[in-house]
């Protein structure tokens, strides 16, 4: 019984987090609410970040590039509330009590849904309708980029990552981190499926489908290392047919100084 107890506690806590983080989207309309519930419930990355301790208590200033309707901001706020109320599982690592969130999203419809749904959160999230290739990035401790960097060409990808590195460096946090989920183009079948689903979801959300530029995992890793990151990779497509990989890129200490 003791062997299953931690999982039971964690599952119950995750269900509570899911309800709390998605409830605000009822104010954004039926689509916003159902999309939030499906995304948080079916995409393994959110719970994976939490249970692996990849969002640390030192990560107070968070930048979410390609934030969509701001689901990550709502999750962070719900995590903080659960900890404050003393219902945080002992197997989960603590996170920042009052994270300062900046979300950057190109699509005006998504930003509007985010404003309608989570604009009331405290601290108030900063939600910018802007292009990640040109948006000003504030000094920060943690940058999250999930499944969006492939929408710009290879040169632009590197330019975005250079600016991310510089924003983390300016933040001066020795725990500075980039969480980057990408598709591994060397896994042809999984990558093709993920691209097809990506295009389908983009259409459903009412957006124009753009061309994409992928890289093999080895190239993503080499690029990040050349920019001064220490990189480890984790499969992050459990329960799906995709070839998604999470790259945990910690800024080398001499880069953060």
What spans do the regions from the language model cover?
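Class I (Rossmann-like) S-adenosyl-L-methionine-dependent methyltransferase catalytic domain
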Residues: 2-61, 69-136, 174-257
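Conserved S-adenosyl-L-methionine
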Residues: 66
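A conserved beta-strand element that flanks and buttresses the S-adenosyl-L-methionine
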Residues: 144
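Short catalytic micro-motifs in class I SAM-dependent methyltransferases
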Residues: 147-148
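Helix-capping/helix-break motifs at membrane-protein junctions
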Residues: 153-154
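A short glycine-rich, Lys/Arg-flanked "PGG" loop and its adjoining helix->strand segment in the class I
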Residues: 158-173
């Amino acid at each position: 019984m003791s062997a299953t107890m931690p999982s039971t506690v964690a599952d119950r806590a995750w269900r509570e987090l899911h309800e709390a983080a998605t409830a605000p989207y009822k104010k954004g309309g039926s689509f916003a609410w159902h999309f939030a519930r499906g995304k948080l419930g079916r995409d393994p990355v959110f719970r994976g970040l939490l249970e692996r301790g990849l969002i640390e208590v030192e990560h107070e200033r968070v930048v979410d590039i390609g934030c969509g309707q701001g689901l990550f901001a709502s999750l962070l706020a719900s995590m903080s509330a659960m900890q404050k109320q003393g219902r945080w599982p002992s197997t989960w690592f603590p996170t920042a009590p009052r994270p300062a969130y900046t979300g950057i999203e190109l699509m005006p419809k998504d930003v509007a849904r985010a404003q309608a749904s989570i604009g009331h959160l405290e601290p108030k999230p900063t939600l910018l309708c802007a292009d990640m290739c040109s948006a000003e990035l504030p000094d920060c401790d943690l940058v999250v980029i999930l499944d969006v960097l492939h929408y710009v060409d290879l040169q632009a990808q590197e330019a975005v990552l250079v600016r991310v590195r510089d924003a983390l460096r300016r933040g001066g946090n020795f725990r500075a981190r980039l969480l980057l989920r990408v598709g591994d183009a060397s896994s042809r079948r999984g990558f093709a499926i993920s691209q097809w689903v990506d295009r389908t979801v983009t259409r459903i959300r009412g957006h124009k489908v753009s061309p994409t530029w992928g890289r093999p995992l080895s190239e993503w890793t080499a690029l990040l290392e050349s920019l001064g990151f220490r990189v480890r990779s984790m499969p992050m497509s459990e329960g799906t047919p995709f070839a998604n990989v999470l790259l945990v890129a910690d800024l080398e200490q001499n880069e953060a100084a």
